[in-house]
Structure formats: C-alpha cells, structure tokens
Amino acid sequence: MSNDYYLIIPAGGIGTRMHSEKDNINRKIKIAKQYLKLDNGLTILDQTLKILLNIDQIKGCIIALANKDYLFTKSKFNNHSKLITTVIGGKKRMNSVFNGLKALTNLAKDDDWILVHDSVRPCVKASEIINLMNQLKHHETGGLLATKVVDTIKQASNNIVNTTIDRSNLWQAQTPQMYRFGVLLKALNTVINDGMNITDEASAIEYLRLKSVLVKSSKSNIKITNSEDLELANFYLTQYKE
C-alpha cells in the first residue's frame, strides 16, 4: 500500500515588524509577514501555497491560522481542492503543527508522510521537495531540507568571542520537514506534555532519540523575517524556472 503525503502550514504568526501595506485612505497598516505582497502580486503565503499545492504527490493541506485571521478568506487558495481545513494556531509553532496533526487523525495513517513548511519560505523549489520525498520514502522516521554551514561560527558572551565552532558537521535547518504521521504526532505530544520549548519538528524527533535525515537544498529557500529578506525573495523568484 502506498503512503499519502499531507502538508501542514503553520501560518498563525502575527509578527508586525514589517508593515508596508496601506489602507483605503493611504495610511500604513501593520500586517502579518505572510500576507505581505511580493513583486509578482501574490502574498508570501499564496506564493508558498502555489509551489506546494502544485506538487502532485501532496494529497491534502491543513493551514494553522491566527485566531482573528481575516485575510486568508481573500487568498486565491481559500477554496483550493487540496485544502482540507484550517485550524486555529497555538501559542507556539509546535502547538500549531500539533493542532494540524489532530485535524488529520481521521485521514492519515501512522506511516503516511507529513510535510511541515514555513508559511514565509516562498522560494522553496518543487524539485527539492520531490527529492526529499524520494530520498526518504523508505525511511522509518523522516528528515528535512537543510544546507551546510559555510560561514565561520563564533560562540560568544556579551559580544566577546569565547571560541570558534567547528563548522564541518554543522547544517542549517530549513523546511519542509517531513516525518511519518504517527511518529510526529507522538513526538509533539510528548514535548508539549513535558513542557519543552522546541522551534522545529526535527527537535521533537530528537527528543524521542530518533534520527532525522538531512537532505541538501538550496540557500535560496530563505525564511522571510525582515525587509532585506523580502527583497532577496523577490530576486530569487525572478530566477525561479520551475
């Protein structure tokens, strides 16, 4: 029996460090990053969904939204055939993803695959996601896209260097992070019940002492956190050929 692939997008962030949208009387208004417009006219979230929902292997999608999110109703993907439902995001990313997993309990089998992808990574390449699927299809747990660290890394206290970290075995985690449904559900349930604070799914898997596979990806798969990232994403998307 083949395994299905489901997508969870945690998009419940309400960070407002970037606010470039204007209202109908030309006032600047604060807006969550995932709803900022790219140069191609799409919001960051819609560009992200455009790439992922176009992948044939992905059967369905759950999106975790902020409690008072009114902007997703304007999304061109609001009624997409692959959108199973939206759920309310939690206080932290892990809670949002866990809520998404609970919404899949009547659909997904334990050995089906769950891809979790940041809503503000709109430059991910479909070919690299498919490569992730192919590399992990026989793995019992899962893994994630990542890039090798190339810069020299310093450990410091109060801006004073303590030591230089050996970068030869260091990787920078990206998304999607892809794990078996049953494993990821157990991992997130465990870290939440134990009061742990984690920032990605791979950390929850590590907490269960399970192993994740790193699959090399492009540095263009950036996470947009500031205006400089937004400019860089616009540049990368002009180079996007897929």
UniProtKB/Swiss-Prot annotation:
The record marks 17, 33 as: Transition state stabilizer. Coiled coil: none annotated. InterPro entries: IspD (IPR001228), IspD/TarI (IPR034683), IspD/TarI_cytidylyltransf_bact (IPR050088), ISPD_synthase_CS (IPR018294), Nucleotide-diphossugar_trans (IPR029044). GO terms for biological process: isopentenyl diphosphate biosynthetic process, methylerythritol 4-phosphate pathway. It catalyses: 2-C-methyl-D-erythritol 4-phosphate + CTP + H(+) = 4-CDP-2-C-methyl-D-erythritol + diphosphate. One of its GO terms (molecular function) is 2-C-methyl-D-erythritol 4-phosphate cytidylyltransferase activity. Keywords: Isoprene biosynthesis, Nucleotidyltransferase, Transferase. Pathway: Isoprenoid biosynthesis; isopentenyl diphosphate biosynthesis via DXP pathway; isopentenyl diphosphate from 1-deoxy-D-xylulose 5-phosphate: step 2/6. It is an enzyme of class 2 (transferase). The record marks 167, 223 as: Positions MEP for the nucleophilic attack. Its EC number is 2.7.7.60. It holds the Pfam family IspD. Gene3D superfamilies: Spore Coat Polysaccharide Biosynthesis Protein SpsA, Chain A. Belongs to the IspD/TarI cytidylyltransferase family. IspD subfamily. Catalyzes the formation of 4-diphosphocytidyl-2-C-methyl-D-erythritol from CTP and 2-C-methyl-D-erythritol 4-phosphate (MEP). NCBIfam families: ispD. This is 2-C-methyl-D-erythritol 4-phosphate cytidylyltransferase. It comes from Vesicomyosocius okutanii subsp. Calyptogena okutanii (strain HA). The gene is ispD.
